[in-house]
Amino acid sequence: MQSRHIVARLSCAAFFAGAPFVQLNAQTGSAAAAALRHGIRLDDVESAAVERGEVIVRVLPTQDQRDVAVFGVVRLAVTRDAYLRRVQDFRNWLHTPTRTGFGLFSDPAVAADVENVVVSRDDAKDLRNCRAGDCTTKLPATEMLRVQSEVDFSARDVQSRVTAIARLRMLQYVGEYRDHGNASMPVYDDRPSMRASDAFAAVLAQSAYLNQAAPAVSAYFRTFPRGRPAGISDVLYWSEDAVARLRPILSISHAVVYTPPEVAGTTVVASKQIYANHYFEAALEVMSVSDRDVSGEPAATYVVIERRFRFDNLPKGGILNIRGRAVNGLRDQMRDDMQREKSAAERLGTR
């Protein structure tokens, strides 16, 4: 069972957690106010820690045992505009240190976009025995059969043949998604059949911040390719994340950057998982980038991130306590990611 190996080193694309939305009554330039935009109350100790430049991370409650939700906040000693210039350099910003592979998709997607995609030897080999309800790779049953009919698993070029099929299918996924949106997201038959679009809809429905403070982004993710907000920037990309003791996670995601006119001084950056070959049925990450505007003090920026992963299976308790280990790993990963991002942003901001 894949989920038995989910451990603290897990890193991949992510989620926004559904805490109740709280209306802002605090000073706009405070750490508490930035967190309240996400429905998270910081106590005085946490607020003071953020102002000192420390990263604050919390694990949040979820409605489904398979979901993991993590919240983090940090203050950057750079302006919002300076930080957003870094973020909107998608090719560099999205290619994080944990990623062993990455590429942006052209519009329309072309073969060169996926020329660096390589299916691992283990994944390629295991497809030989895949069947509906029992497969180590997340695929529709029709694609399991296609691979088995087109690949000679006794040949020496199994990995390259499976990789060629995967590259073509990724281009098809992107083209279909651009034309038809969520309705074209894959059906996963590695376990009992489920639609990736249904899992994502469940995650999106719990995103109180995105739905109430940035409803245009929520609606865009729900109705894409319709309803594109004016001024939004978006990109589709693939990534492969290396995870110790786990199979490499190959995924396709849709990222957007948007400054809602109804939320002064804040830009929203969100990422939606379209496909992942292991572990995740759905993932969503929402980051808000807000001005810290305090009279007499240097300009700074609050970055608040909320992530959710919906796993295919995440048992809790017992000797293994898979859920507990996954939660701890994702919490630690959030802290590491935010500390690294703070260091990189402030280093670039001083140039």
Where are these regions (language model features)?
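C-terminal segment of classical bacterial N-terminal signal peptides
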Residues: 17-25
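A short alpha-helix/helix-coil micro-patch that ends at or immediately precedes a cysteine
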Residues: 86-89
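Bacterial N-terminal signal peptides that target proteins for export
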Residues: 1-12, 21
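Terminal "cap-and-tail" regions of soluble proteins that handle hydrophobic small molecules
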Residues: 27-76, 80-82, 92-93, 97-351
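Generic detector of short alpha-helix boundary/capping microenvironments
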Residues: 6, 14-15, 71, 277
